[in-house]
């Protein structure tokens, strides 16, 4: 018997991994990457708007991001949003475009970023464990309500644990790869 609880747990764990993956993409590794700006929100006519919807982002050089606003009047708003973000980058505004120079990472900064990757990984693993906990509760309820037998419950609990272990392993692997990328620069 294939249980809907298992399928739902797999979907939710995969969503947690996808969120972690998108968060990892915004972690700076010393090279220009447009996804660094994915979480930057610009106050535009009183409405928080994602920067990526307000400007074209190009990479003219390996360590330079160039932001060309669709509306030139939003240039200062974009500059303020970048300064207010947690990117730690200083925008250079020439009146037409904003340039972000991605500095070389120092050894100390690389270690800080590697720790941040670890924190993000731990948050993702907590999300996976929460999904596991919900699935286990649902299985216990199904057994209590007579929908599944006690043996089926045990078998399905093992399956949930297997999916949890696989998800956790995948998160650890992604974190290790990102740490290597950061440390090696």
From Swiss-Prot:
NCBIfam families named in the record: frr
Similarity-based family: Belongs to the RRF family.
Major location category of this protein: cytoplasm
Keywords: Cytoplasm, Protein biosynthesis
KW Nucleotidyltransferase (keyword) present: no
Entries under InterPro entries matching the protein: Ribosome_recyc_fac (IPR002661), Ribosome_recyc_fac_dom (IPR023584), RRF_sf (IPR036191)
An example Gene Ontology CC term for this record: cytoplasm
UniProt function note: Responsible for the release of ribosomes from messenger RNA at the termination of protein biosynthesis. May increase the efficiency of translation by recycling ribosomes from one round of translation to another.
Domain of life (superkingdom): Bacteria
Protein name, entry field: Ribosome-recycling factor
Subcellular localization, as worded in the UniProt entry: Cytoplasm
Molecular function terms, GO-annotated: ribosomal large subunit binding
PANTHER family in the cross-refs: MITOCHONDRIAL RIBOSOME RECYCLING FACTOR PSEUDO 1, RIBOSOME RECYCLING FACTOR
Claim: Cytoplasm is one of the keywords in the record: yes
Chain positions covered by the region annotation Disordered: 138-185
GO biological process, one term: translational termination
């Amino acid at each position: 018997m294939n249980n809907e609880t298992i399928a739902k747990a797999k979907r939710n764990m995969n969503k947690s991994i996808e969120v972690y993956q998108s968060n990892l993409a915004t972690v700076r590794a010393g090279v220009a990457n447009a996804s660094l700006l994915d979480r930057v929100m610009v106050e535009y006519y009183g409405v928080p708007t994602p920067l990526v919807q307000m400007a074209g982002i190009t990479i003219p050089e390996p360590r330079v991001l160039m932001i060309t606003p669709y509306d030139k009047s939003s240039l200062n708003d974009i500059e303020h949003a970048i300064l207010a973000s947690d990117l730690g980058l200083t925008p250079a505004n020439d009146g037409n475009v904003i340039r972000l120079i991605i500095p070389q990472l120092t050894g100390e900064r690389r270690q800080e970023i590697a720790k941040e990757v670890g924190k993000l990984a731990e948050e993702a693993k907590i999300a996976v464990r929460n999904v596991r906990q919900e699935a286990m509760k649902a299985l216990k309820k199904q057994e209590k309500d007579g929908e599944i037998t006690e043996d089926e419950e045990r078998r399905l609990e093992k399956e949930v644990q297997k999916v949890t272990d696989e998800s956790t392993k995948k998160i650890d692997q992604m974190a290790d790869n990102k740490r290597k990328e950061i440390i090696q620069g």
